[in-house]
Swiss-Prot record:
Protein name: Fibrinogen beta chain
Main location: secreted
Modified residues (Sulfotyrosine): 4
UniProt organism field: Lama glama (Llama)
Localization (cell): Secreted
Length: 19
């Protein structure tokens, strides 16, 4: 991820998946 912490990265990926 970019500009995001490792923990945030997981949430971001999940959000993209839900999309």
């Amino acid at each position: 991820a970019t500009d995001y912490d490792e923990e945030e990265d997981d949430r971001v990926k999940v959000r993209l998946d839900a999309r």
